[in-house]
């Protein structure tokens, strides 16, 4: 299986620290571990604190599959992530 780096850019409806606390929660870390997904970077746009970049690395298609999982979508949205604002790019 190829290693893939996935870049998510999206808007949030809560302060970044609040969103990051959910992303860094034990539950989310466990979900990522089970899928062999590693967070390489997360941050906010310099001039727009509602714009987030998240860079993850894992097996090909793993990050996108988790993001698109209907069971995970409510967790994503409950963190303040505006789901429909998400742009995804993948790199090998």
For each of these PLM feature ranges, what is it?
Residues 1-74, 82-92:
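Short S/T/G/P-rich N-terminal loop/turn motif that feeds into the first structured element of a domain
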């Amino acid at each position: 299986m190829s290693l893939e780096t996935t870049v998510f850019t999206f808007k949030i409806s809560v302060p970044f620290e609040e969103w990051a606390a959910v992303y860094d929660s034990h539950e989310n870390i466990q979900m990522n571990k089970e899928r062999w997904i590693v967070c390489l970077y997360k941050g906010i746009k310099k001039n727009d604190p509602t714009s987030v970049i998240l860079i993850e690395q894992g097996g090909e298609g793993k990050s996108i599959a988790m993001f698109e999982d209907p069971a995970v979508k409510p967790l994503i949205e409950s963190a303040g992530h505006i789901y429909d604002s998400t742009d995804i790019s993948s790199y090998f």
